[in-house]
């Protein structure tokens, strides 16, 4: 194992955990309305938080776009998922205009935010030091912890709910990491992640 890659993978785990803790702490400081309860009186605070949350993911996105993984991705693999995202956004605007903010939340904050942090940065760094299985296990534990911890701290969830979020995060990490590696593009896991969560929100 390359010691430099091993060291970078440890740093990546630490950075992502710090990002998670700060993000959740900020959400606790700035109480937020859930998407279903947005009104003219509370939407500004929600937008402010979401903009800051999106901005916090920019450094992770930048590391991906500077990486060899992005440069070696074929053009169609880069463009097709983003084209489909544009189609989805258009359809939501026409069919469900009252859910447009929720769609962009799940696309930018959940899809882009989580995938750039966990696949575009963490998984990519782990893969330099470990094989796919080990990378998914380590990344999955962090991804599961992120969901369980935020659910507990922000929503005060039950033990069953926390364990469900933790397990779902691990399974999600496996699925999205496999999609990322198979497609060699961050666009596909972003699209699928955002669509799954948005559909879950609608249901």
Predicted feature locations:
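Membrane-interface helix-boundary motifs at transmembrane edges
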Residues: 2-5, 66-77, 123-131, 180-184
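Hydrophobic, membrane-inserted alpha-helices
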Residues: 83-91, 173-174
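Membrane interface segments of multi-pass transport proteins and intramembrane proteases
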Residues: 30-41, 73-74, 126-137
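Hydrophobic alpha-helical transmembrane segments
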Residues: 1, 19-33, 51, 55, ...
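Transmembrane helix-loop-helix hairpins at the membrane interface
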Residues: 96-203
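Residue-level signature of transmembrane alpha-helical entry/exit and packing/kink sites
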Residues: 8-16, 42, 46-50, 78, ...
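Juxtamembrane "helix-exit" motif on the non-cytosolic side of transmembrane helices
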Residues: 25-37, 91-99, 148-154
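N-terminal, membrane-interfacial amphipathic/helix-forming hydrophobic leader that caps
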Residues: 1-69, 198-203
């Amino acid at each position: 194992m390359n010691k430099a890659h091993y060291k970078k993978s440890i740093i990546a785990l630490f950075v992502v955990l710090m990002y998670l803790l700060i993000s959740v702490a900020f959400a606790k400081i700035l109480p937020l309305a859930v998407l279903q309860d947005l009104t003219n009186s509370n939407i500004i605070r929600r937008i402010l938080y979401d903009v800051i949350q999106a901005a916090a993911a920019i450094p992770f996105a930048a590391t991906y776009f500077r990486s060899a993984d992005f440069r070696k991705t074929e053009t169609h693999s880069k463009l097709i998922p983003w084209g489909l995202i544009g189609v989805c956004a258009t359809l939501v605007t026409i069919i469900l205009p009252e859910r447009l903010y929720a769609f962009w939340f799940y696309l930018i904050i959940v899809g882009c935010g989580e995938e750039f942090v966990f696949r575009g940065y963490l998984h990519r760094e782990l893969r330099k030091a470990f094989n796919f299985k080990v990378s998914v296990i380590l990344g999955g534990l962090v991804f599961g912890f992120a969901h369980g911890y935020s659910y507990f701290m922000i929503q005060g969830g039950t033990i069953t709910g926390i364990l469900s979020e933790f397990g779902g995060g691990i399974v999600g990490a496996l699925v999205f990491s496999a999609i990322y590696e198979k497609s060699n593009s961050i666009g596909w896991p972003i699209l699928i992640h955002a669509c799954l969560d948005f559909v879950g929100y609608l249901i």
